[in-house]
């Protein structure tokens, strides 16, 4: 079985919330895709409940797309502590952390239920499992700690 970088990471040494560049893959024609670890809560200490995580996922799909050129996808970790973010090119962890911070601020401060995309039976595979209340609470808690652009040393972005 191939090695998975995320499983090689010592989860006891990281300090969430943070943004970490996992890898940059280069295609046959030189195109680059960056994979980021958007870790919102400390591994093995907490996990975001599925309803809140699901709603954050749906909102980040649009909010990060508006803030990061080359956005491809943002998918939750199975452990429910954060997300993988895939983008074309090589944005800095600082730029990604700032975009994440702005997006979580938008969720915390401005988003209403009507703003949450994909909440119908036609548009979501598990449309009943959403919680804007939870998404707002978790966004608030994450922002209170600050988002670092370094996973091992706290360097909170403004």
UniProtKB/Swiss-Prot annotation:
Positions that bind Fe cation: 54, 58, 124
Alphabetized InterPro entries for the sequence: LuxS_sf, Metalloenz_LuxS/M16, S-ribosylhomocysteinase
An MF annotation (GO) of this entry: S-ribosylhomocysteine lyase activity
EC number, UniProt record: 4.4.1.21
Signal sequence segment: none
Similarity remark: Belongs to the LuxS family.
Function according to Swiss-Prot or TrEMBL: Involved in the synthesis of autoinducer 2 (AI-2) which is secreted by bacteria and is used to communicate both the cell density and the metabolic potential of the environment. The regulation of gene expression in response to changes in cell density is called quorum sensing. Catalyzes the transformation of S-ribosylhomocysteine (RHC) to homocysteine (HC) and 4,5-dihydroxy-2,3-pentadione (DPD).
Subunit (UniProt): Homodimer.
Protein name: S-ribosylhomocysteine lyase
């Amino acid at each position: 079985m191939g090695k998975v970088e995320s499983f090689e990471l010592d989860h006891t040494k990281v300090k969430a919330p943070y943004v970490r560049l996992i890898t940059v893959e280069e295609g046959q024609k030189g195109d680059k895709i960056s994979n980021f670890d958007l870790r919102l809560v400390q591994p093995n200490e907490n996990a975001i409940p599925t309803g809140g995580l699901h709603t954050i996922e749906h909102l980040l799909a649009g909010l990060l797309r508006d803030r990061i050129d080359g956005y491809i996808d943002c998918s939750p970790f199975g452990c429910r502590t954060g997300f993988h973010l895939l983008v074309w090119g090589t944005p800095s962890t600082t730029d990604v952390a700032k975009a994440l911070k702005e997006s979580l601020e938008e969720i915390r401060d401005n988003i209403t239920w009507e703003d949450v995309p994909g909440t119908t039976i036609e548009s979501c595979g598990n449309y009943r499992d959403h919680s804007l209340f939870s998404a707002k609470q978790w966004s608030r808690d994450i922002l209170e700690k600050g988002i670092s652009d370094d996973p091992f040393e706290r360097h909170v972005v403004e």
